[in-house]
Amino acid sequence: ARETAWAARGLGARLNGETIRVSEATDLARAAVSTGNIGSLARSNRWASLGRIMARANRTRGYGDYYHYHRLAAGQIDAVIESDVNILDIAALVVIVREAGGVFTDLDGNDPGLDTTSVLAAAPGLHGELLDRMRA
């Protein structure tokens, strides 16, 4: 897809020049969830938690790379879960998603930092539930 997303703290987010916002989703049973790199998650005790999330979600996708974060920021999907990232993969995406109104943390609910290796990014109305489900 040919698209350009950008954001600046306090100035919002844009995709191809248009202002974007995350969805207002609050119900996982009606939500679309995308996963990216999940190799280490598959080898952890959280694999079952992810399975329960995916079984409950309305739709699941596996876009990967930047693309599912753009879809999240534009309100076209509702959450992204990944377990194998580094700060270079996500630094710009954190700003884009947050400026579009989303919540962007690691799988433990911490703000991204230099040592971040996982992501839970979602519409505000879903993030807390997804975080709780990943911890279960």
Where are these regions (language model features)?
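DPxDG-like acidic metal-binding loop motif
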Residues: 1-14
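An extended, acidic
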Residues: 21-136
